[in-house]
UniProtKB/Swiss-Prot annotation:
Organism: Vibrio cholerae serotype O1 (strain ATCC 39541 / Classical Ogawa 395 / O395)
Gene3D superfamilies assigned to the protein according to its UniProt record, in alphabetical order: GHMP Kinase, N-terminal domain, K Homology domain, type 1, Nucleic acid-binding proteins
Gene from which this protein is expressed: pnp
Binding site for Mg(2+): D487, D493
Job of this protein: Involved in mRNA degradation. Catalyzes the phosphorolysis of single-stranded polyribonucleotides processively in the 3'- to 5'-direction.
Subunit structure: Component of the RNA degradosome, which is a multiprotein complex involved in RNA processing and mRNA degradation.
Cellular localization per UniProt: Cytoplasm
Assigned EC number: 2.7.7.8
Cofactor(s) for this UniProt protein: Mg(2+)
Name by which UniProt lists this protein: Polyribonucleotide nucleotidyltransferase
Residues annotated as domain S1 motif: 623-691
GO cellular component: cytosol
GO biological process: mRNA catabolic process; RNA processing
Length: 712
């Protein structure tokens, strides 16, 4: 039934990788089962043979989906099946997309869809790297005009050594989590998070990862040669040189002048006017011309004008030199009721960032294939349409917003205090209110400021900067703090976040080949200078966390009780703790080791909760006098509550110093009495005496102190 499948197995660091095709999804353009030590991802590629007429963009879609059966689980929820992509799935889809997109040729507009499905997972092997390898292999055997294959590698930094594809366990000890992808001679994509490493260490990790992944590229080339799929008969559309010359004659000089306008919206208005006038003039001359083709040629001319000016050493679009950072404006405490806030403005890019403190109960529970985990630091990025002067749909976050939020979070994570140092869940939200390039890095700066304003004891200020590159043959210019146009028209987007002493996050997307180690080194060094400048301005506004948190934030008080007492504080069916939280207006969390965290915005409420917990957990001591309440009467004596949940018996002979015939003659239920603890037997029963309490009091005996546990 099946033709003989093609299988390629090779060693990749400590892992064994297997690529297999020919058995499953034979109606797809290409399909590969990629396996790395029991983590298996099935990747399909489908390309449409015909492009949509008049389409001027490349419709590539990458879907990444994790099936819970891969980990031997059944999904939660009412429907018991997988739903919309999680944040993690969205991020890995972007990770696959970014290095493959620039390898399709200009002019190729056929629709292509990649679907990567995780079908088996080894908890120690993350599925992202093998998903990228599987995608590369599937594209390599698809026959599509794909200028690959690519390799992918994760790099860790453990005990001063670079480690290829570290396991989940090793990553916990690593100071670096870096993913690099590229072809045999070029790095195309880097995504990383670091514990404040130097620029040299980051670059060494990128080069190491690129060198190591050559084994993957070699194996995929051999795999593709064995499959031997015929290449598609696709020919790049012929260039309309006549129309190109006409557009240049009408627009080039005017575009050069338009790009002297430094204000973004005014420049856009002028360029739009030129485009409309050129299009109208050409259509008046020949009605048969394609408007979309005119616009594409006009856009390409814009790109040429800007790039030529930058390579020539002229001032940039907004008048800056190549290594200048735009004007900065930094403000903190801009919103009165938030726990922390900042407004960070860099040129025409602006972020309003807030920090909110919550309890451990507010932590996000993330249900991953490898297990459940809690995240106590959340960072969300919003990019509303008004920030670029447009109208648009407002709803759930798009892929780009999720990706930018994660990048900003990576930049800040290294300086966040541990839950033990700061027992709060922290949520940061960045609202982009203006955008003209590098809004994710503005979010990093604003987040650092808002956290300090909220009193979160971060280890250092963090700033981010976006770098760009324009390269023509052997000439290149590295640009600091790029504008949106420079990002769009350039060859590289290179974002670096870090403190004054090192890098915390690095993201790189390269659109061309030929980016050398020297160019990356120059970009990193130039980024460091820009970062230090931004940090100096930020430190003038706020250089350390405020000494106290906001009056509107919950204050968390920590106390410790005996593990045996946890059940007493919780009560039967949670009755005691529920009553405590309702009556004191606090939030109470109890950990397995007896640590209790009490959160309240009102200090008196917290004190009352602490007092009551101390009462509940206090131990009865022999020889100590307590003030208790008579709980019930019996013929042989009375039961008295001396501590919450702790009753003792006053025998009829211990009520008074004379003979008592009837208990009710001396006591009533609810009456407060002083009693002395005579004995606690082996079964924990407490024997009390009223008459000895009176005698001891007369002798100036010590009355029972409050229970001992102390709260911080």
């Amino acid at each position: 039934m099946f033709e003989k499948p093609v299988v390629k197995t090779f060693q990749y660091g400590n892992h064994t990788v297997t690529l297999e095709t020919g058995v499953m999804a034979r109606q797809a353009t290409a399909a590969v089962m990629a396996t790395m030590d029991d983590t298996a991802v099935f990747v399909s590629v489908v390309g449409k043979k015909e492009a949509v007429v008049g389409q001027d963009f490349f419709p590539l879609t990458v879907n990444y989906q994790e099936r819970t059966y891969a980990a031997g689980k059944i999904p939660g929820g009412f429907f018991k099946r997988e739903g919309r992509p999680s944040e993690g799935e969205t991020l890995i889809a972007r990770l696959i997309d970014r290095p493959i997109r620039p390898l399709f040729p200009d002019g190729f507009t056929n629709e292509v869809q990649v679907i990567a499905t995780v079908v088996s997972v080894n908890p120690d092997v993350q599925p992202d790297i093998i998903s990228m390898i599987g995608t590369s292999a599937a594209l390599a055997i698809s026959g599509l005009p794909f200028n690959g294959p690519i390799g992918a590698a994760r790099v860790g930094h453990i005990d001063g050594q670079l480690v290829l594809n570290p396991s989940e366990k090793e990553l916990k000890q690593s100071r670096l989590d870096l993913v690099v992808a590229g072809t045999d001679n070029a790095v195309l994509m880097v995504e990383s998070e670091a514990q404040i490493l130097t620029e040299e260490e980051m670059l060494a990790a990128v080069v190491f990862g690129h060198d190591q992944q050559q084994a993957v590229i070699k194996a995929i080339n051999e795999f593709a040669a064995e499959v031997a799929t015929p290449a598609w008969e696709w020919v790049a559309p012929a260039e309309n040189t006549e129309l190109k010359a006409k557009v240049a004659a009408l627009a080039e000089t005017r575009l050069v002048e338009a790009y002297q306008i430094t204000e973004k919206m005014a420049r856009y208005d002028r360029i739009h006017a030129i485009s409309s006038e050129v299009t109208a003039a050409l259509l008046a001359e020949n009605e048969a011309l394609d408007t979309k083709e005119i616009h594409t040629i006009f856009h390409d001319l814009e790109k040429t004008v800007v790039r030529r000016s930058i390579i020539a050493g002229n001032p940039r679009i907004d008048g800056r030199e190549k290594d200048m950072v735009r004007a900065l404006d930094v403000r903190t405490g801009v919103l009165p009721r938030t726990h922390g806030s900042a407004l960070f403005t860099r040129g025409e890019t602006q972020a309003l960032v807030t920090a909110t403190l919550g309890t451990q109960r507010d932590a996000q529970i993330i249900d991953e294939l490898t297990g459940e985990k809690k995240d106590h630091f959340l960072l969300h990025y919003n990019f509303p349409p008004y920030c670029v002067g447009e109208t648009g749909f407002v709803g759930s976050p798009k892929r780009r917003e999720i990706g930018h939020g994660r990048l900003a979070k990576r930049g800040i994570a290294a300086v966040m205090p541990s839950p033990e140092e700061f027992p709060y869940t922290v949520r940061v939200v960045s609202e982009i209110t203006e955008s003209n390039g590098s809004s994710s890095m503005a979010s990093v700066c604003g987040s650092s400021l808002a956290l300090m304003d909220a009193g979160v004891p971060i280890k250092a200020s963090v700033a981010g900067i976006a770098m760009g590159l324009v390269k023509e043959e052997n000439d290149f210019v590295v640009l600091s703090d790029i504008l949106g146009d420079e990002d769009h028209l350039g060859d590289m987007d290179f974002k670096v976040a870090g403190t004054a002493t090192g890098v915390t996050a690095l993201q790189m997307d390269i659109k061309i080949e030929g980016i050398t180690k020297e160019i990356m080194q120059i970009a990193l060094n130039q980024a460091k200078g820009a970062r230090l400048h931004i940090l100096s301005v930020m430190d003038q506004a706020i250089s350390a966390a405020r000494s106290d948190i906001s009056e509107f934030a919950p204050r968390i008080h920590t106390m410790k009780i005996s593990v045996e007492k946890i059940k007493d504080v919780i009560g039967k069916g949670g009755a005691v703790i529920r009553q405590l939280t309702e009556e004191t207006g606090t939030t109470i969390e109890i950990e397995d080791d007896g640590t209790i965290k009490i959160a309240a915005t009102d200090g008196d409420q917290a004190k009352e909760a602490i007092r009551r917990i101390q009462e509940i957990t206090a131990e009865v001591e022999v020889g100590v006098i307590y003030t208790g309440k008579v709980a019930r009467l019996a013929d042989f004596g009375a039961f008295v509550t001396i501590l919450p949940g702790k009753d003792g018996l006053v025998h009829i002979s211990q009520i008074a110093d004379k003979r008592v015939e009837k208990v009710s003659d001396y006591l009533t239920e609810g009456q407060e009495v002083q009693v002395k603890v005579l004995e606690i037997d082996r079964q924990g029963r407490v024997r009390l005496s009223m008459k000895e309490a009176v005698e001891t009091s007369d002798a100036a005996a010590e009355v029972a102190p409050q229970a001992a546990p102390q709260a911080e």
